Amino acid sequence: KHGIQSTIHTGGPSIPGSGLIDKDVVLEADADIIGHINGGHTSLPEAHVCELCEKSSRAIEIVHNGNEKIAIAAAQAALQLKCPHRIILGTDGPAGSGVQPLGMLRMVSLLSSLGNIPAELVFCFATGNTARIRNLNCGLIEVGRAADFVFMDRAQHTAGRTLLESVQLGDIPGVGMVMIDGIVRCGRSRNTP
């Protein structure tokens, strides 16, 4: 009604004095986004996470600072339910787990390699899906959208012959340049493989 988007915490307590937000609370709240469905820090049981994917029609946020096994299970459940358009990725940082500068790329690599999900689809979770669901002006290449780009390639000496193949094998891409609002903000770091 007022253009405000709601996200619900999912899983164990995040700060002292808070409590568990279980599947029943998440379903009853019916927030726009099931926040860190794989926990932040502590995840719900896998069966409950899969039930949330099935019984809710809302966005499913999978995060770096959560349970990796449950991250894969949530993504696979959404794919089996034929709703990959609901999956968005995040880091859940900064948080008690700290800040992970490559958290999004690590999530893409994790879900692709260990979850056996095509890398190009996981990149879509991180970019286009997230942009659409969170109403962002980035994440998609279209006239009128922000000119924000990350130029990357396969890491040197990876077993993968292409960027996508190297990600599917579990390697993190080498970032060559970041452009925000059409302006180059940074180039390759000294440590980029």
Predicted features by range, described:
Residues 35-38, 123, 151, 179:
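Residues embedded in well-ordered beta-strands within globular domains across many folds
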Residues 43, 47, 68, 72, ...:
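Electropositive phosphate-/nucleotide-binding environments in soluble metabolic enzymes
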Residues 147-193:
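C-terminal cap of metal-dependent C-N hydrolases
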Residues 15-17, 131-134, 159:
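Short gly/ser/thr-rich secondary-structure transition/capping motifs
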Residues 76-155:
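His/Asp/Glu-enriched, well-ordered alpha-helical/loop segment
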Residues 1-98:
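Active-site core of metal-dependent hydrolases
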Residues 27-30, 104, 143, 171:
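Extracytoplasmic/secreted proteins and extracellular or luminal domains
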